[in-house]
């Protein structure tokens, strides 16, 4: 086991313990997009199950969105060799996105909603206890700033949440994992990564701008990324302006 994998194991098991993400006997569905993050999570979590660290029933779900150039042959071979239960479901969400999104606009929002809808549907149909997503620490940091800058809200990606209809529980075991470690792990393991040609062709994405902003700030102060992450668990409601968080009448007497 490499130092990188040991590091990933440490932060993943810490998040699972800190936020009580898994219970004994859980039937869980890990969403494998074909990218480095979900591949890394799968490899580590599968190893932890093999080592008897977790007693859970793991099922891998991949959504083929019918994007041009999609080839999952190597992904299938990888999953077969790993020996995990999996299903690759084909839904032409790509066609819907191309039809609905005006030229020049980004596809990410609609694409994500359609993908999320299929994930939730599949989880309910197969009576999954939990849905596992591969978002990492940098995703949380970027999402917080994006919400503030572009939506006027303070929110990010929680380690665990229940969907609005109460039907699905979603967990993110990699909320403490840095992207750079996942990049290194993907190189070490030579995962059969499937690039997202749809997203990759759109250069002016908001997330890329925010990511660059954080990187620039970190050059001046390396603690910036960790400070942003820590802010998500160090909230001072009395220092905000949401009237639902405090008694406005009491504060003006």
Swiss-Prot record:
- Gene3D superfamilies the record matches: HUPs (3.40.50.620)
| InterPro entries in the cross-refs | Rossmann-like_a/b/a_fold, TilS/TtcA_N, tRNA_Cyd_32_2_STrfase, tRNA_thiolation_TtcA_Ctu1
Protein task: Catalyzes the ATP-dependent 2-thiolation of cytidine in position 32 of tRNA, to form 2-thiocytidine (s(2)C32). The sulfur atoms are provided by the cysteine/cysteine desulfurase (IscS) system.
EC numbers on record: 2.8.1.-
Subunit info here reads: Homodimer.
Tagged with keyword Membrane:
no
Reactions it catalyzes: cytidine(32) in tRNA + S-sulfanyl-L-cysteinyl-[cysteine desulfurase] + AH2 + ATP = 2-thiocytidine(32) in tRNA + L-cysteinyl-[cysteine desulfurase] + A + AMP + diphosphate + H(+)
The alphabetized list of GO BP terms reads: tRNA thio-modification
Report the Pfam families cross-referenced here.
ATP_bind_3
The record's listing under CDD domains reads:
TtcA-like
Q: What is its main location?
A: cytoplasm
SUPFAM superfamilies named in the record: Adenine nucleotide alpha hydrolases-like (SSF52402)
Pathway given in the UniProt record:
tRNA modification
Organism expressing this protein natively: Francisella tularensis subsp. novicida (strain U112)
Required co-factors = Mg(2+); [4Fe-4S] cluster
**UniProt-recorded Gene Ontology molecular function terms:** 4 iron, 4 sulfur cluster binding; ATP binding; magnesium ion binding; sulfurtransferase activity; tRNA binding
Which compartment or compartments is the protein found in?
Cytoplasm
Name of the featured protein: tRNA-cytidine(32) 2-sulfurtransferase 2
Chain span(s) of sequence motif PP-loop motif: 33-38
Cofactor: binding details = Binds 1 [4Fe-4S] cluster per subunit. The cluster is chelated by three Cys residues, the fourth Fe has a free coordination site that may bind a sulfur atom transferred from the persulfide of IscS.
Taken from the UniProt entry, a GO cellular component term is:
cytoplasm
**Additional observations:** The thiolation reaction likely consists of two steps: a first activation step by ATP to form an adenylated intermediate of the target base of tRNA, and a second nucleophilic substitution step of the sulfur (S) atom supplied by the hydrosulfide attached to the Fe-S cluster.
Q: Which UniProt keywords apply?
A: 4Fe-4S, ATP-binding, Cytoplasm, Iron, Iron-sulfur, Magnesium, Metal-binding, Nucleotide-binding, RNA-binding, Transferase, tRNA processing, tRNA-binding
Instruction: Give the family, as the similarity comment puts it.
Output: Belongs to the TtcA family.
User: What residues bind [4Fe-4S] cluster, as annotated?
Assistant: 108, 111, 199
